[in-house]
Regions:
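Bacterial Sec-dependent N-terminal signal peptides
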Residues: 1-31
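Phosphate-group recognition and catalysis centered on beta-loop-alpha active-site segments
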Residues: 20-310
Length: 310
């Protein structure tokens, strides 16, 4: 009987394996990152790379995205704009002037005409083989590998959702936007019905106050995560961050510029590695569980030494 039971169990497992096309049930990197994001008790820090790996490749380009995936980055932040024929493409600016060999608003180009332009590299050199990618092209590269923060994209929610569904990566998408508590509640409902994660952006003023954060702490459903910006570090930041995390939300910091993180930024940590704990360590002490960075490789190395990143 025991042998029959073991054989039956083996057949069940084998059938499950075959029904999945012979693929392992091991969670994908994107699924692992999403699970960490959704778990308030998770200690691992999520690393989000700002405009992908723009230090080594054109920002918002396919090679830049592929580079941060190889690094082990958890979230890639990309920016979207729409062409004149209604196609979402990756562009931080409303014009193509800074990042390509062309000029004019993105919205004045059809996709075909935009694809004739060539992206500029880190030092302004023209990249003969690289054009602005579409959002669909970018999400296809990201599928199963990395979460995607679609910045400048909230006004295009239906279009982003349609593309994400086509690529089958809806649960990898993160939206963020500023606005009132009521606007956030409506956005959370809209995103929650699809599986997309919505993250409100809140700011602590130089005087240490934030009416927006206060409105969240007054009650109601809390978002999974807040993006918190603060130009001046103070004990008020400690108070607010503790209140948000005690309420069950995670918090995201932008270490890309000092004006967004009380001068605890990437460049200070990178240029003075012996003092990295003064900067990154301070942000960790505040309870931040996601860092948007311009130094993804350096930050990952710092976090791994502390056992805070896989």
């Amino acid at each position: 009987m025991r042998r029959i039971a073991l054989l039956s169990a083996f057949v069940t497992i084998a059938a499950a394996f075959i029904s999945c096309g012979g693929k392992s049930s091991e969670p994908t990197p994107a699924a692992k990152a999403r699970a960490i994001l959704l778990d308030p008790a998770a200690e691992k820090i999520l690393v989000a790379s700002h405009r992908a790996d723009w230090r080594h490749h054109p920002e918002n380009s396919i090679p830049a995205i592929e580079s941060v995936i190889k690094m082990g980055v958890d979230i890639v932040e990309i920016d979207v704009a729409m062409t004149s024929d209604g196609v979402l493409v990756l562009s931080h600016d409303s014009t193509v002037d800074r990042c390509t060999n062309g000029s004019g608003p993105v919205s004045s180009f059809t996709l075909d005409s935009l694809k004739q332009l060539r992206l500029k590299g880190t030092h302004g050199e023209i990249m003969d083989s690289l054009a602005i990618p579409t959002l669909e092209e970018a999400l296809t590269v990201c599928k199963d590998k990395i979460l995607v923060n679609v910045d400048h994209g909230w006004n295009y929610f239906p279009q982003v959702l349609e593309i994400a569904r086509k690529v089958d990566c809806v649960d990898q998408i993160i939206f963020k936007s500023g606005g009132t508590r009521q606007a956030t509640a409506e956005a959370m409902k809209q995103c929650g019905e699809t599986g997309i994660i919505f993250m409100p952006i809140v700011t602590v003023a130089k005087d240490g106050t934030s009416e927006t954060i206060d409105s969240y702490l007054d009650g109601g459903e809390m978002p999974v995560m807040f993006e918190v910006c603060f130009s001046k570090d103070s004990t008020a930041i400690d108070t607010y961050m503790k209140a948000l995390t005690d309420a069950g939300s995670k918090i995201w910091v932008n270490s890309i510029w000092g004006s967004l993180c009380g001068d605890n930024d990437d460049e200070r940590a990178y240029k003075s590695p012996e003092d990295a704990d003064l900067y990154y360590g301070r942000l960790l002490s505040l309870g931040f569980k996601a860092f948007q960075t311009d130094r993804p490789e350096y930050l990952i190395g710092y976090l791994r030494k502390k056992g805070l990143h896989d």
